[in-house]
Design a protein with these regions (language model features):
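Cytosolic, long alpha-helical scaffolding segments
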Residues: 1-158
Length: 158
């Protein structure tokens, strides 16, 4: 884990911590949205799929919160070097997580349609694929929050 000295202005550290917390909440919500959308697909549960579709708005709101917070930090704190890279990374991560949430919503939408049709060939690989996606999201966010380049590079080897 990379260690960084605290900033002279404590509120700057608090702002960065708040941004990390928003990204972490987004990641957790993405993980659950993916798992639940695949569960709805596999169990052919249209009601569960509808809940997932409605929950996508929470991810959209968190992305907007992350963007607003990042812009505020940049405007008020004028971060440099590592701090600026972390904030820009958080902005990009928020966008990617929101897109992942959209994919989960899309799975849920399709599962509602599939629930009304006849079962088709084996789909046993879908839950395993979802498990791997959730694992990679979790490990990526851990590397980001811990500011650990070794963990981040290890993800490239997967």
């Amino acid at each position: 884990m990379a260690e960084f000295a605290a900033h002279t202005v404590k509120s700057f550290d608090e702002d960065i911590a708040q941004l990390r917390a928003v990204i972490t909440r987004m990641g957790g919500l993405c993980e659950s949205q993916i798992a639940e959308s695949v569960d709805a697909l596999m169990s052919r549960n249209a009601e569960a799929a509808q809940i997932i579709i409605e929950n996508d708005k929470r991810l959209d709101a968190l992305e907007a919160e992350a963007e607003a917070l990042a812009v505020r930090i940049i405007a008020l704190r004028a971060p440099l070097a590592d701090d600026l890279r972390e904030i820009v990374s958080a902005l990009k991560i928020a966008g990617v997580l929101e897109r992942i949430g959209d994919y989960a919503k899309n799975i849920a939408k399709r599962s509602a349609v599939i629930a009304q049709s006849q079962p088709v060939g084996p789909a046993v690989i879908i839950p395993e694929m979802a498990r791997l996606v959730v694992e990679i999201i979790r490990d990526t966010l851990d590397a980001f929050v811990d500011r650990d380049p070794v963990k981040a590079l290890a993800l490239l080897q997967r």
